[in-house]
């Protein structure tokens, strides 16, 4: 088991520290490559949650190219009054206008991050967790689970078992799963969730590690006829922890599946279409 430090963009924004943010993605990918190749493994499980950690892990996963499963680290709980981190700007503005007192501002600051997990809105971290699943590199339904849920630990253990299965039975590598069609699916999901624009930095970098080229024009072409479906902050009303309970990535894909490449492979060893059908039949959405 190896760890690599990550940074928090929320803490570095507005300071010179933000200049280190994108560089940290490269360092994470580099350290994954170093550890995986210095101590050879037959398979890997990668777990990350946040802005540069998720794309860094996906880049490293592609570079190492051993049978692998990615585990999204989940989303933070909402605070009292459904408070989430991106609302602090609103509270700060209200304080500056004299609409709330300092005590209320301090309350918001102290309650906006009540648990571990990615910030509870569709920022870069949430977007990239969703992209990992949309690419077929995470188990179905695992993106943006509440980080405090015991189900997340169960899925992490299942990811380990699945990594062993694909190593023993099929030796299926990330490069056998991810294709241009996989990236087109992910970009359509990105449109449907109104995902972070930072995805335009990260998906091309991940694609590059797979020897695939995508550009801003790729996003533009696919987004023009795409549907926006997700009512989650900052573009919508609800905290990101609601995403999982509404069906998560599979529910989004069901809504847009006529536009998706359903024959792409995933880490389950089955196609996307097979996964979606299996989830419907096994009561996933009712749960």
Positions of the model-derived regions?
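Catalytic or ion-coupling anion/metal-binding cores of large enzyme and transporter domains
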Residues: 1-4, 17-21, 54, 60-66, ...
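Long, structured ligand/cofactor-binding scaffold of large enzymes
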Residues: 1-72
């Amino acid at each position: 088991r190896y760890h690599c430090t990550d940074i928090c963009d929320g803490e570095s924004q507005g300071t010179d520290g933000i200049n280190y943010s994108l560089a940290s993605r490269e360092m994470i990918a580099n350290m994954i490559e170093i550890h995986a190749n210095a101590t050879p493994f037959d398979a890997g499980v990668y777990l990350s949650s946040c802005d540069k950690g998720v794309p860094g892990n996906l880049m490293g996963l592609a570079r190492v190219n051993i049978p692998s499963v990615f585990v999204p680290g989940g989303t933070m709980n909402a605070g009292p009054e459904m408070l989430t981190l991106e609302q602090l700007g609103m509270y700060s503005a209200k304080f500056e206008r004299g609409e709330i007192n300092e005590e209320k501002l301090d309350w918001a600051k102290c309650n906006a991050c009540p648990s571990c997990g990615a910030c509870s809105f569709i920022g870069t971290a949430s977007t990239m967790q969703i992209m990992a699943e949309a690419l077929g590199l995470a188990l179905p339904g695992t993106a943006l689970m509440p980080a405090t849920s015991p189900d997340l630990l169960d899925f992490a253990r299942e990811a380990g078992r699945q990594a062993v299965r694909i190593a023993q039975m099929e030796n299926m590598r990330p490069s056998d799963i991810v294709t241009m069609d996989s990236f087109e699916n992910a970009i359509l999901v990105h449109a449907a969730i109104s995902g972070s624009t930072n995805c335009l930095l990260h998906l091309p970098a991940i694609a590059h590690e797979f020897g695939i080229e995508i550009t801003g024009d790729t996003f533009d072409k696919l987004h023009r006829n795409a549907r926006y479906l997700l009512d989650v902050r900052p573009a919508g009303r609800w905290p990101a922890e609601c995403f999982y309970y509404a069906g998560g990535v599979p529910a989004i894909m069901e809504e847009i599946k006529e536009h998706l490449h359903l024959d792409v492979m995933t880490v389950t060893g089955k196609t996307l279409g097979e996964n979606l059908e299996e989830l419907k039949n096994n009561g996933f959405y009712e749960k």
